[in-house]
From Swiss-Prot:
A motif (Nuclear localization signal) lies at residues 565-568. This is RB1-inducible coiled-coil protein 1. It is found in: Nucleus; Cytoplasm, Cytosol; Cytoplasm; Preautophagosomal structure. GO terms for molecular function: protein kinase binding.
Length: 1588
């Protein structure tokens, strides 16, 4: 296992030991520095996902470091270099020598050694292929990792931008709040200045410093025990705070420094007055303080420390002066003049960070996918090399095992073919390697530029982020300091209030402790007395029969209340006395005197009354000791009595006493207690028990518990049961009364008399009444027997009853008060709730009514306005809709024209060279036009100056007239009051009539002008449509002619080999560029059309506004006239007539001047129109000349291309003819040589045969002579017969040998012929390849020229766009000039209107007294009407001029677009011609040529395996697919896709076409793996045999 780090700059993987994963990132950086010499400061380590690795964290905490997910390293030194990092190119030792080795091995003879050397070469080629494939895979893997690294750094950039945006948003929000509160901060600082001056005058009390010093040292407070230590601490505190001589100087220095800091604030244009106020207040405070200090130096005691000195000492060196200085420094740093440009820079950095063109690498994923496909083809080539190498090894093993030399020639020939295939595969692998290396280098170059951008952008963002953080800190610190300032400004008031509060609390504690002591003392006595009484009664009543039956609850105990002293509080208060407060009153300034008032003492009378009441209650409780004495006597009697005495005898007097109770009281309705004589005074109400907001709740009634207490509900009854010694009637009445009270206050009282509980109670009470009545009868019969005992008991009972009545009367009064208050509070609550409900309902009703009324009124107004607006804008909308529809139709037609003419742009190559010269001419024309425009501007400037002078003179005259007029009005105002009303009524009527007439005239004129404009626009649109239709017809005719030419050229199609298919990629790139240019042109057209429509809309809105302004101006004039009529009065007729005549003459002269100015402006407009028309005619003529030149150049280029095409066709025909002639000549030579060789062999064989026959005849003759000579003829005959037989056998053997030799010679000749044929074929192929390469080079040059021309056309298009932009700029200038003229005309119109207003006013004012001058106001009205008509005419003329300009500019743009479209079409056609030329070879089909287009039956085709479709297809350069029929697979010895893998299937085979059928995919899932609806051919073919 290793740790993988990927260097993104160069795309290399760095490996390290896994021990570094346990160590920190800093150790990893040191390891990278030591191993790869990359400095630590230049290293940036990023994990997938964008997280940057921290130096102090361990490497293993990040989920990265594997080979698939490495740590991405960025070298900043490489990024900041100007040159991109170079990718190292790896070359293997044998990859370049393979071709030489193959050529050498092909030259070797057919021997075993050649077989072994070729197998070794094949194995070497396979090894090299494996290395190349692994190298290419590594390169592509590195590119994938580079892509991942770029994605990681982009994620990091995204995180940085998000954090930067959050920081900026936070700062903007805080800074906006700060800007809103600047004035508040300045006000707080001024308050602090006044507070500082006050604090300097307030002396610090000595006891306060002792207290704080004691708190610092942590010593306990002991005010009475440690007086000596307090004195020592006081001395130390005075030494620590300040010496007695220092405070004056420090105070003055502080105030002066505060003043200086106020002066040194950054000057704010809005807050200068506030700064002056601050300075004045500071100076006044300094002067006052110096005077006060000088006056009071003699009166100050020894401990002379002010409150300001103590505050300054608390946090040295941060005193008040430094606090204020820091506040003003930070405010000057946060000046909007400094911050706002910085904020703009921050927003610009955010925009730079969000640059999508730099973030996204367009087309990289498609490129990586293509590289993956290339790697897959590379692996296929390696597998093919492997199979071939294994075949070589197998053939070598067979040859070694057979050891037959006759097999070697065929084996060597097949080896040669296989070596050529391996060499081709090797070349392909080298090509793939080259492509991969170039792709990696290009990606590295691209990433270098983008990483440099990323580095600079992030650096800028970091710098701005640091500034933002510093500014944010500054704002936060400033706001915190302002809070401190706010707190310090309230210190004098708080100091005085705290001193007063301490004095008040001291006074209160004194009285409160006295009252609490007396209360606790009396409470203890009362509680102990009650406790002893209950204990004695409990001992007596414990064994009674009535204990748990009739008298329940007698075992309860009273709760302990006011038996303990309250806890200590306010122990740590400083020792401030009234003397100290008076001292402060005498020395503190007047600003603080309202806060230093002596607190008023509480009203302690209720406390004294409460103490007296408690004393009386204790006396009353102690006065009942006779009852307790009787109880003790009874207890003693029980002890003395005998054991025979029953418990009933002891309880008999109690039972007898109860009879009285039952007779007098009823259980259902107990009567209230009536106390006649009270032994103790009335108890105060509960509100008076506590003084000054200290009520009875200070003591917790429930917390002091008793061991025998029950729940809180029962404790109230227990308190009432404490009166058990009282007579039983009173006791029962009190209990019943309490129960009723509880039932009233309880949430669920039992009030139903028919409920089961009430029925049981009634039954129980009836039974008790019956028993009591029976007892009364018994006692009446026995009354005489115990009369003496009754008398004594009766006396005692009366005493007890009196005491019980006293106690119950006090309780009854308390309960009555409580009940009264409870009912009062409940009534108040109910009344309040009802009142709130009623008021809420009333308010809601009012709000709803107001809402309804407002909604109704608003709806009515809105509907009226909507109706008026609908009526006004319906006609405008109809016109605009018509225009928009016409524009949409035009756009659609333009789009159709664009689509139809897109093919012509590719063929316009040399046209734009002439446009340069034309552009120069246009530039000259533009310069001349600019000069003329400058001259016109100068003239306009001079005229404008003259108009200003005239206006000034007119204004002076008007001011003089107004002064005279005002004087006369003041003198004659009192005389003409009686005539005012009649004259005003008549004038109002006449003015109303005239206004209506003038308004109707203006409206009619406006409608007429609008109708004229509509008619003119419609005529122009019709003319445009007619011209557009004629141009479309002409273009359609041209298109038809061009289509005929294309059809003529498309008939000349021929064949070409497989290698030309690689040029399609270049054409695709050109198509992409063309599509981009088309889209840009479309966008330009859309934008121009939208701009024109918007301009038209704005002009229409301007016209409406002008009409509305005119109406408003007329209305304003009428209102002014009415106001003047109401203010002014009739004056002397004779003087006014004379003055009026003079003023009218002056005004006529001014009006003449204004009309002359109007005429001059109209003449200037005419001149401008003429110049515009001239410029338009010039531009039209120049454009027509440009079009003519373009047409001429197009025809010349077409002629050139036709000539080139003819020359190419002639060259091809010559080549084909020469090739055929060479081939025939070679075949003839081969036949001739073959015949010659056969004849020579036969001749030699005949000669040899004759020689052998001659030799045999001579031998026979010689043998016959020998036989004849010898005597033993018979023996010789036998020998001769044996010799003849032997000779015959020899002859036969020799014949056989000769025949074998002949056969061998024939075989050799045949092999030689085959070798000659193969060599001829190879020569033919090489010649054909050379011709092809030449043709290819020529066509590549043509394509390059075309691409260069296309680039030039694109450049020229850009220049045309610039020209269009310049024309649009000229148009904008003209529009601006027009606007300026309109503004001047409007100014002149307003001035004329203002001048005509007083002229019309004067005669109308005095019309009642001067009937001889009725025509003067009518003249002024007519003049204003004439001026309005002139303005409307001028506006209509300007509108027509503007529309003419817009239409002419539209025509120019349309002409340029059409020329561009024609160029695109011609470019496309020329590209198609070039493609057809490059794909055409020989028109006549030859049997031994491979067809690559337009397959027919009998054509020789190349059948290849297409892995995308998993089928065999015919190799073609056309877009249509030709699939091989599945029935033809066995005939061609091919395997189907289902039965064999891609490695074992043959990659290609040659065949002949037998059948062809046209098909279409009807299912999405099909065996050819094509999309639904795809059209293709299915072809049947047979194997091609060269011999056949």
């Amino acid at each position: 296992m290793k740790l993988y780090v990927f260097l993104v700059n160069t795309g290399t993987t760095l490996t390290f030991d896994t021990e570094l994963t346990v160590q920190t990132v800093a150790d990893l950086k040191h390891a990278i520095q030591s191993k790869y010499k990359i400095a630590i400061q230049h290293q940036v380590l990023v994990v997938n996902g964008g997280e940057c690795m921290a130096a102090d964290r361990r490497v293993c905490t990040y989920s990265a470091g594997t080979d698939t997910n490495p740590i991405f390293l960025f070298n900043k030194e490489m990024i900041l270099c100007d040159r991109a990092p170079a990718i190292p190119k790896a070359t293997f030792s044998t990859e370049n020598d393979m071709e030489i080795k193959v050529e050498e091995s092909l030259m070797m003879p057919a021997v075993f050694h050649t077989v072994a050397s070729r197998t070794q070469l094949a194995v070497e080629m396979y090894d090299v292929a494996k290395k190349l494939c692994s190298f290419c895979e590594g390169l592509v893997h590195d590119e994938h990792l580079q892509h991942q690294g770029w994605a990681a750094i982009m994620a990091n950039l995204e995180d940085c931008s998000n954090s930067y945006q959050k920081l900026l948003f936070k700062f903007e929000s805080i800074y906006s709040d700060y800007l809103q509160s600047i004035e508040d901060i300045k006000l707080k600082l001024t308050h602090l200045g006044t507070a500082v001056s006050v604090m300097a005058k307030i002396p610090l009390l000595e006891c306060l410093t002792r207290h704080s010093y004691r708190e610092c040292l942590g010593r306990p407070d002991s005010l009475n025990e440690h007086e000596g230590s307090e004195k020592a601490e006081m001395k130390r505190s005075t030494e620590l705070v300040l010496s007695p001589d220092m405070p004056r100087t420090t105070n003055t220095s502080l105030v002066t420094s505060f003043h200086k800091s106020m002066e040194h604030v950054a000057p704010d244009p809005t807050g200068t007055e506030r700064g002056k106020e601050l300075r004045e207040s500071c100076q006044s405070t300094v002067q006052q303080e110096e005077a006060s200090v000088d006056a009071k130096d003699s009166d100050l005691p020894f401990f002379n420390v002010s409150l300001l000195d103590w505050i300054n000492v608390q946090d040295r060196p941060n005193d008040v002066e430094s606090l204020v200085r820091k506040c003003f420094d930070s405010m000057s740093r946060l000046d909007p003049k400094i911050i706002q440009p910085f904020m703009l820079e921050c927003h610009q950095t955010i925009a730079k960070l969000d640059n999508q063109n730099m973030k996204a690498i367009k087309g990289l994923e498609d490129r990586l996918y293509a590289l993956d496909q290339m790697i897959a083809s590379c692996s296929r080539l390696v597998n093919e090399q492997k199979e071939l190498a294994q075949g070589f090894l197998a053939n070598q093993m067979r040859a070694e095992n057979l050891k037959d030399a006759s097999v070697l020639p065929d084996l060597c020939l097949s080896h040669a073919n296989q070596l050529m295939i391996m060499l081709q595969n090797h070349r392909k692998l080298l090509d793939i390697k080259q492509k991969c290396t170039t792709a990696k280098q290009e990606l590295a170059n691209n990433l270098h530029v983008r990483l440099k951008w990323c580095c600079f952008v992030m650096l800028h963002a970091d710098q701005d982020g640091e500034k933002l953080q510093a500014l944010l800190r500054l704002v936060i610190e400033l706001l915190e300091r302002v809070r401190i300032v706010e707190a310090l400004s309230t210190v004098p008031q708080m100091y005085c209030l705290a001193v007063v509060e301490v004095v008040r609390r001291k006074m209160f504690i004194k009285h409160y402790r006295e009252w609490a002591g007396a209360l606790v003392k009396d409470g203890k006595q009362l509680y102990e007395a009650e406790k002893s009484k209950r204990e004695s009664f409990g001992k007596l009543f414990r064994k009674s029969f009535l204990r748990n039956r009739l008298f329940k609850g007698l075992d309860s105990w009273p709760s302990s209340f006011c038996t303990q002293k309250p806890r200590k509080f306010d122990c740590e208060l400083p020792d401030i006395s009234l003397k100290d407060l008076q001292f402060l009153q005498s020395f503190c300034p007047s600003e603080v005197q309202p806060f230093l008032r002596v607190p008023l003492l509480c009203d302690f009378e209720p406390l004294h009354q409460h103490v007296l009441a408690l004393h009386n209650l204790v006396k009353a409780a102690q006065s009942l000791d006779e009852m307790s004495q009787t109880i003790t006597d009874l207890l003693n009697e029980q002890k003395v009595s005998t054991s025979q005495a029953s418990p009933q005898s002891a309880a008999s007097p109690r039972i007898e006493s109860t009879t009285g109770i039952t007779t007098t009281t009823s259980p259902k309705t107990p009567p209230p207690l009536t106390v006649q004589d009270t032994l103790c005074p009335a108890v105060c109400p509960l509100e008076e028990l506590s003084p000054d907001s200290i009520d009875a709740h200070t003591f917790d009634f429930e917390t002091i518990s008793h061991p025998n207490t029950e729940q809180p509900v029962h404790q109230a009854s227990i308190d009432l049961d404490s009166l058990a010694e009282s007579p039983e009637s009173d006791f029962m009445s009190a209990v019943n009364e309490f129960v009723i009270e509880e039932n009233l206050s309880s949430p669920n009282p039992i009030s139903d008399p028919q409920s089961p509980e009430m029925m049981v109670e009634s039954l129980y009470s009836s039974v008790i009444n019956a028993i009591d009545s029976r007892r009364m009868q018994d006692t009446s019969t026995r009354g005489n027997e115990g009369f003496g005992d009754r008398a004594a008991l009766h006396v005692q009972l009366e005493k007890c009853r009196a005491a019980a009545q006293d106690s119950h009367s006090s309780i009854q009064t308390i309960k009555d008060d409580l009940c009264h208050f409870r009912t009062f509070v409940q009534k108040e609550q109910c009344d309040l709730a009802n009142y709130l409900k009623c008021t809420a309902v009333e308010i809601r009703n009012i709000i709803e009514k107001v809402k309804c009324s407002l909604e109704i009124t608003l709806k009515e107004k809105h509907q009226q306005e909507l109706q008026s607006l609908k009526i006004e804008y319906e006609c405008k909308l109809d016109a605009l809709v018509k225009d928009s529809e016409e524009n949409v139709n035009k756009i659609l037609k333009l789009k159709e024209n664009l689509v139809s003419l897109e093919e012509a742009l590719q063929n316009k190559d040399n046209e734009f060279t002439s446009i340069k010269h034309e552009k120069d001419a246009i530039v000259c024309v533009q310069q001349e036009k600019d000069q003329k425009l400058l001259e016109m501007e100068k003239i306009m400037h001079t005229q404008h100056c003259e108009i200003k002078e005239l206006k000034q003179s007119r204004e002076m005259a008007l001011e003089d007239l107004k002064k005279l007029h005002d004087e006369k009005i003041e003198s004659l105002r009192a005389e003409f009051q009686c005539l005012e009303q009649n004259h005003l009524k008549e004038l109002e009527d006449t003015l109303h009539i005239r206004h209506t007439q003038e308004f109707e005239k203006v409206m009619t004129d406006h409608n007429m002008s609008l109708e004229k404009l509509k008619k003119e626009n419609q005529q122009r649109i019709d003319q445009m449509l007619e011209s557009h239709a004629s141009t479309i017809q002409e273009k359609e005719q041209q298109l038809q002619e061009l289509k005929l030419k294309v059809s003529d050229l498309s008939d000349m199609r021929c064949k070409l080999e497989v290698e030309l298919a690689l040029k399609e990629a270049e054409t695709d790139e050109i198509k992409i560029l063309l599509e981009e240019s088309r889209t840009q042109q479309k966008e330009m057209l859309k934008s121009l059309l939208e701009q024109e429509t918007e301009n038209l809309r704005t002009e229409i809105s301007k016209l409406n506004q002008k009409i509305h302004d005119n109406n408003e101006s007329y209305q304003v004039g009428l209102s002014e006239l009415r106001a003047l009529m109401t203010i002014e009065k009739d004056q002397c007729i004779s003087e006014l007539i004379s003055r009026h005549e003079e003023e009218s003459n002056i005004l006529k002269a001014e009006l003449d001047n204004v009309t002359s100015l109007h005429r001059q402006a109209y003449e200037i407009e005419k001149k401008l129109k003429e110049q515009i028309v001239e410029l338009q005619t010039r531009l039209n003529s120049e454009l027509s000349a440009l079009e003519k030149q373009k047409d001429e150049k197009i025809t010349q280029q077409e002629e050139k291309y036709e000539a080139l095409i003819q020359n190419l066709e002639k060259d091809k025909e010559r080549l084909v003819k020469n090739h055929e002639q060479d081939k025939e000549h070679l075949i003839q030579e081969l036949n001739f040589e073959k015949n010659k060789a056969v004849q020579t062999a036969l001749d030699e064989f005949k000669v040899e045969r004759e020689l052998v026959e001659k030799e045999l005849l001579e031998k026979v003759k010689h043998l016959e002579n020998q036989i004849a000579k010898t005597p033993a003829f018979e023996s010789a005959r036998e020998d001769s017969s044996s010799l003849v037989a032997e000779l015959q056998e020899k002859l036969q053997e020799e014949k056989a040998k000769f025949l074998e030799q002949l056969e061998e010679q024939e075989k050799r000749k045949n092999e030689e012929m085959q070798n000659v044929r193969t060599s001829l074929i190879a020569e033919q192929q090489t010649n054909f390849n050379t011709v092809l390469t030449r043709e290819k080079m020529r066509k590549e040059n043509i394509i390059n020229d075309l691409s260069d021309k296309l680039k030039s056309t694109m450049q020229q298009q850009e220049r045309d766009k610039d020209l269009i932009e310049s024309l649009s700029e000229d148009r904008a200038r003209l529009l601006e000039e027009k606007k300026q003229l309109e503004e001047e005309v409007s100014k002149l119109r307003t001035s004329s209107f203002l001048s005509s207003a007083p002229v019309a006013a004067a005669p109308e004012l005095y019309g009642a007294c001067a009937p001889e001058l009725p025509g003067e106001p009518e003249r002024s009205v007519m003049e204003t009407a004439d001026e309005g008509r002139l303005d409307s005419a001028m506006e209509t003329s300007m509108m027509s001029v503007q529309e003419n300009m817009l239409s002419e500019e539209k025509q120019r743009i349309m002409l340029l677009e059409r020329t561009l479209q024609l160029k695109e079409e011609e470019n496309k056609r020329l590209n198609q011609r070039l493609m057809s030329q490059s794909l055409s070879s020989v028109s006549s089909r030859h049997s031994e040529k491979i067809a690559i287009r337009d397959f027919q039956v009998g054509d020789l085709v190349l059948i290849i395996l297409d892995e995308r479709h998993d089928n065999y297809v015919l190799f073609t350069v056309s877009p249509t697919l030709y699939f091989l029929h599945s029935e033809s697979l066995p005939a061609l010895d091919l395997k189907p896709g289902e039965g064999a893998s891609g490695a074992s299937r043959r990659p290609w085979v040659l065949g002949k076409v037998m059948e062809k059928e046209y098909c279409q995919a009807k299912k999405a899932q099909n065996r050819f793996k094509v999309p639904l609806g795809t059209k293709f051919y299915r072809v049947k073919a047979v194997s091609w045999n060269k011999k056949v």
